[in-house]
């Protein structure tokens, strides 16, 4: 199975600083002393996934990890992976779409928040590639997030072995227009396919 791994290195930076999200405020957050959140959480997830695969040692179920080198991928992968090149200069939905189009993964594992989820779903377009979110942002209302990084690893492995089926889930995010008026309102921005698990998924 081809597992694409992407980390939004700016996700979650504003959490401890009281920001309502990190979109457009990453530099400000880092200047104020914010530390990486999404990357270390992805590493926790992949550490657990490696632990699971090593304990089972199944030859019939293997995982090939595809990732960019650098902070959006390779820096957080505790083992071998297939490099798809350096992290692009423009790390937006368009670069993510090109990543998906070029490598056609069977499952897309990402670390970030609701804003990251929206970018990925936009990048997927009409593709039915399933996604699993490692919780690493400030806002995580979407149903494609696992409850913890280690839960995300369990979901990935259970999907690889065929123990989980796919289901549609809602992609949610803060309505920025309403938020500018001082109101907190979360609304639906689309749908995504994700492995269904009441135990490990939100």
Regions flagged by a language model, labelled:
Residues 9-10, 114-115, 137:
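Short glycine-rich anion-binding loops that position phosphate/pyrophosphate groups of nucleotides
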Residues 107, 111, 120, 124-148:
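Short, acidic/small-residue loops that bind anionic groups at enzyme active sites
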Residues 73-74, 114-117:
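Alpha-helix N-cap/helix-start and coil->helix boundary motif
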Residues 68-69, 110-114:
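Glycine-rich beta-strand-to-loop/alpha-helix junction loops that act as flexible
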Residues 1-106, 153-202:
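ATP/NTP phosphate-donor binding region
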Residues 18, 118-119:
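Residues at secondary-structure transition points
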